[in-house]
């Protein structure tokens, strides 16, 4: 006899928590799952990106995920969240109330990824993972003043490129 317990689809969909990886190659193996779960949450539109990242982290590593492991997860997953958020936006759309188009942001972030990856990581953590400047500084083991300075520089640089 088949019971509801035997046909429960959540057992198939949900995967048990995994141990946060140490090796970069192990993180890369998790990348498709992280991207899929972030995309599902983004298309549902129910959560800000930072909250979605934290939810995926808890799904992956369980409720007992340490702050250290969550930080490592955010450093790895924030660029994925950025690409998904920008990918879902219309290239002609503007960012907030500004004159900045999504396409301009895509080009600028691509440049930043190549020429100042640390600043790009700061932007990912601050704007896409929702961390404060202090939290971003702690995650990257930098002083808050350095993070604030670099975020201000990035914003000013973007404004000069778009004038």
Regions from the PLM with identified roles:
Residues 1-163:
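Intrinsic, short, N-terminal disordered tails of RNA polymerase sigma-factor systems
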